[in-house]
């Protein structure tokens, strides 16, 4: 390898602009591969100051190789797991009317999702314990 090739390779690997942080704790939340893919894409697109982004289902699907309906299913799961908050937006049309815009996604603090996940695990454990004992939950 000559000097020019070595410089070219180091430039390709250089720069934090080609990377974004992903918290390791997402692997402790019982997420499946589809949920991780959608969550990762939202983290990639988020504004690092507001923790928000607004890609369409189609844009997310194109990026992660899923249909619009599959993306919606995983977004709903991420909301349920308290990893993201979703709110509708409105856009003004050229003729002055209003129409629905893309959803606005807010990436929530991971601690809330971890707490929710642990609560769900405790509920499941309690229900299983009661079922083994032959009693029903109150």
Q: What are the roles of these predicted feature ranges?
A:
Residues 1-11, 80, 106-138:
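Charged low-complexity intrinsically disordered patches
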Residues 72-73, 81:
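A general lysine-centric signal
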Residues 57-61, 74, 104-106, 124-127:
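Short, low-complexity, polar/charged sequence segments that are solvent-exposed and flexible
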Residues 18-20, 52, 85, 106, ...:
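Compositionally biased, intrinsically disordered/low-complexity regions enriched for serine, proline
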Residues 1-70, 76, 98:
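Short recognition helix of helix-turn-helix/winged-helix DNA-binding domains
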Residues 56, 89-116:
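Short, cationic-aromatic polyanion-contact patches
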Residues 80-90:
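A short, conserved structural fragment
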Residues 49-51, 56, 84, 102, ...:
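Generic alpha-helical propensity signal that fires on short helical segments
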């Amino acid at each position: 390898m000559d000097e020019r090739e070595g410089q070219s390779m180091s430039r390709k690997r250089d720069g934090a602009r080609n990377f974004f942080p992903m918290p390791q704790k997402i692997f402790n939340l019982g997420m499946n591969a589809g949920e991780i893919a959608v969550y990762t894409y939202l983290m990639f697109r988020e504004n690092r100051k507001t923790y928000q982004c607004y890609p369409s289902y189609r844009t997310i699907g194109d990026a992660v190789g899923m249909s619009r309906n599959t993306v919606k299913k995983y977004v709903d799961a991420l909301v349920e797991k308290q990893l993201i908050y979703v709110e509708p937006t409105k856009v003004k049309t050229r003729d002055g009317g209003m129409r629905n815009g893309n959803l606005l996604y807010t990436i929530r603090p991971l601690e809330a999702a971890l707490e929710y996940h642990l609560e769900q695990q405790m509920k499941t454990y309690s229900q299983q314990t009661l079922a083994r004992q032959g009693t029903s939950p109150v």
